[in-house]
């Protein structure tokens, strides 16, 4: 599993997302949840997406593994994101980001043997992973790092 572009995941609406469609743009993956202290980061994620959308794809990945803070159905998640934060960036189906049922996307993002860069553990909701325009992991950022932080934006373009 050396290539991000070969990994399969569905959108919140159940349609396949082809990461290969995003070659030439950076991708920011964020595990998201509706009932988290960091949920307000949806606003900054949307701001970041709008500001850099010619060069950046933002992908929210719902996960219910941290404090059961994303219990909603696909329809509930979509409505929450649109009504409360005007989210227009991609949201995937709900997946596990750690553990024995970890989704292959997160197996790639968190394991050096897959991404070629570094290993990490997803510690909480709104942890961010930035991938460059060639599908290579740049770095990860803990929840406390705001989406609009220069730690992230300096790598976009």
Tell what function each PLM region has.
Residues 1-20, 40, 104:
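N-terminal "domain-start" segment that seeds a small globular fold
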Residues 11, 31-35:
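Amphipathic alpha-helical repeat scaffolds
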Residues 25-26, 35, 39-64, 81-85:
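Conserved helix-turn-beta segment immediately C-terminal to the redox Cys motif
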Residues 55-73, 88-99:
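Thiol-based oxidoreductase modules, predominantly thioredoxin-like and allied folds used
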Residues 75-123:
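Short, internal strand/loop/helix patches
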Residues 107, 112-157:
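Thiol-/selenol-based redox modules, centered on thioredoxin-like
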